[in-house]
């Protein structure tokens, strides 16, 4: 008998078909998962000529309302081996009930729910495709072992660590720790066939748009063993212009940056205590610090007493100036984007909405072609579909709840019309176009045959 490392739990090899009226699980087998036809409710924008008998073969973007397990089973027949990028954001199983999802499933039921879906998702991936699973710390450990089993541990790529909120934003004071990190597990369908897309320097060039103009000689002091020129607020000007390689990036000195690099530590140790002496909005030109080859770095004290943090300005690091491509970092700070996420798409999805910035990063890790398919079977408010559409990719989104109609449908209509200028729209120059089909899963073909007398019980 072959031995292997695996998770074991009750009903592992069964399929959770749903919950009864008392909230107890209804278990079945894979054979109980019957493929369904799609029934179109609405065609939005530009779609291919109608062939309503088989919407799976149309090649149009699909927004599907219905149980995602049944929908995935239906897609498997037509899309096996065709999906380039799959992103899912399943319920985190935190026990925190919120409006749009049952986020408190019993632990083993949650694992069974995930296993059945992961097995089909694996079959849908193209040989060079990637699966991305968004999760927090509650189920991360168990999920990692489960996905290793389903996808193959050798196909694990990395875990993308997301900073989703600032550590100084305390949500609940009675917790042992303040959670600011979430995770995205990344798996290839076949690791040897997978090519991750590296980033070019131009990706971050938009941040380098600041220029510091000095109007006087300032005064020179020795601060912390470094030569520092100090300027009053009326002796300098910060100009924001078009991004270029000779401009500077402004960095807010907050959170981990305070202790995470030499600039943050210097500011906290030597410049913060000088605010009372030098005054607010003082500019410091500190010599011999930074890795951008300039030989100095500008620091600014907080503007006034209403502000807690200062800033520093840096150029493009030397090691990146000559590099045409750089590997993706497995850490992404999306705190600023999360602060604006409720504005995105014109729909509200509190506590569960994901930012378009994140989905753009994930899709572009693996997808480069307009022929690539992107799938999200826990579509939520429609972010994955919206981003895939704006990036010119083909997409399929599945959502069970009523918000398929109240959130996803109106959001994606605004994307098609070009009305949606939130999220990544301005970054990618989105003006509208394309289209999709809004569908529901049809009735059980087996049940219909029984009712029509085509199948009879003896």
Regions found by a protein language model. Give the residues of each.
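DnaQ-like (DEDDh/DEDDy) 3′-5′ exonuclease domain used for proofreading
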Residues: 1-85, 94-108, 113-116, 292-297
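Conserved proline-anchored active-site loop of SAM-dependent methyltransferases
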Residues: 81-96, 147, 374-388
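Conserved phosphoryl-transfer catalytic core
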Residues: 403-449, 454-457
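Conserved S-adenosyl-L-methionine
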Residues: 7-9, 107-111, 140, 355-427
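Glycine-rich adenosyl-nucleotide cofactor-binding module
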Residues: 52-74, 336-375
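Conserved Class I SAM-dependent methyltransferase catalytic core
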Residues: 107-161
């Amino acid at each position: 008998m072959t031995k292997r490392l695996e998770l074991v739990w009750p009903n592992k090899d069964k399929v959770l078909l749903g919950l009864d009226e008392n909230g107890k699980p209804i278990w079945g087998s894979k054979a109980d998962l019957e493929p369904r036809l799609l029934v179109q409710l609405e065609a939005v924008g530009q779609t291919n000529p109608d062939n309503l008998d088989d919407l799976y073969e149309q090649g149009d973007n699909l927004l599907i309302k219905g149980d995602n397990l049944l929908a995935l089973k239906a897609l498997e027949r037509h899309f096996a081996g065709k999906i380039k990028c799959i992103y899912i954001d399943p319920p985190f199983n935190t026990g925190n009930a919120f409006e749009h999802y049952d986020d408190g499933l019993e632990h083993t039921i949650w694992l069974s729910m995930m296993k059945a879906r992961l097995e089909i998702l694996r079959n849908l991936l193209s040989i060079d495709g990637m699966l991305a699973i968004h999760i927090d710390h509650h189920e991360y450990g168990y999920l990692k072992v489960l996905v290793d089993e389903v996808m193959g541990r050798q196909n694990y790529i990395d875990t993308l660590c997301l900073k989703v909120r600032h550590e100084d934003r305390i949500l609940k004071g009675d917790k042992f720790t303040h959670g600011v990190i979430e995770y995205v597990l990344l798996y290839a369908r076949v690791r040897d066939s997978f090519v991750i897309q590296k980033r070019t320097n131009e990706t971050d060039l938009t941040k380098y748009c600041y220029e510091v103009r000095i109007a006087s000689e300032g005064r020179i002091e020795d601060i912390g063993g470094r030569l520092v020129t100090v300027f009053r607020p009326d002796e300098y000007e910060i100009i924001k212009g078009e991004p270029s390689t000779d401009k500077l990036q402004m960095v807010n000195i907050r959170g981990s940056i305070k202790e995470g690099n030499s600039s943050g530590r210097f500011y906290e140790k030597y410049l913060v205590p000088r605010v009372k002496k030098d005054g607010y909005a003082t500019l410091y030109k500190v010599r011999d610090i930074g890795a951008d080859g300039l030989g100095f770095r500008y620091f600014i004290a907080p503007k006034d007493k209403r502000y807690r943090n200062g800033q520093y300005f840096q150029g493009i690091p030397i090691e990146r100036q000559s590099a045409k491509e750089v590997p993706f970092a497995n850490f992404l700070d999306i705190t600023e984007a999360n602060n604006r996420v409720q504005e995105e798409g014109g729909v509200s999805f509190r506590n569960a909405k994901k930012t378009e910035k994140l989905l753009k990063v994930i899709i572009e890790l693996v997808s480069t072609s307009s022929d690539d398919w992107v799938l999200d079977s826990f579509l939520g408010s429609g972010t994955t579909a919206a981003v895939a559409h704006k990036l010119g990719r083909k997409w399929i989104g599945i959502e069970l709840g009523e918000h398929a109609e109240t959130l996803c449908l109106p959001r994606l209509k605004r994307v098609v019309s070009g009305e949606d200028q939130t999220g990544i729209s301005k970054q990618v120059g989105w003006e509208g176009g394309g289209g999709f089909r809004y569908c529901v899963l049809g009735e059980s073909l087996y049940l219909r045959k029984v009712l029509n007398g085509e199948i009879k019980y003896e």
